[in-house]
């Protein structure tokens, strides 16, 4: 096909500048800006390539969805020809289209080595249906996310804005040590699951923060809260292979798997709770205060991880986390 694009004087002025060359002023057009003018003028003729994707079918089988080439043109040649034509009588330029490969091709996807489960976790849901809505929305947004070698995964970035316009609802959270509600309440369960995927696969723990209070549905110490603008959950893929996150809600649980090629041998362990602190009574002056009785004591745990390959230790680390007691809450 073909198309005619007519640039207005205002458009051409916005992409033009004069530069000194051999004692003369010569017209130079910005290739990128001029190309944008052409693309907007011929939207049906030109198209972006479509990147390949790696999807986990039925949570059992990795599948490469092939890339599609786009239709484009030589931007540099267009700018040169247009600058030359601007000084001639007819001011017309003919430019041939060409096939433009996607940024991430089918071949690129196949080289990622996504073939097996390298870590997994399942955690039980609460009986709060509203909270479960957030987890269903959240897992759908995160599922089939590809983390390339040396790439960092950010859960907040993968989820996008946590607001009502994007399907999230208000549910229970812990704010300043007290129970409250906020948009996206419950997403810390997804944060916990995805943290465990990266941690158990030997990936770099870039950022995670356990809860201030312990919830028995999560692995002690190996869990992660999430709060937009404050606490993210991030890990970095430190292997030569791509990794795809598969996560979903079913049968009263949040399931998560990390698909890749096994690279690291990983051993994790959590100490028994120590340094226990008995609960007390706390006064919550907040307007949305929820009174509650005392629960379990506070305590500290130490989480350790040894990451090795071919018998050589790559990392031998540990961290401590202290949980607050579940205090009796009185509203004032």
Role assignments for model-derived ranges:
Residues 1-332:
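Well-ordered beta-sheet/strand-loop patches within structured domains
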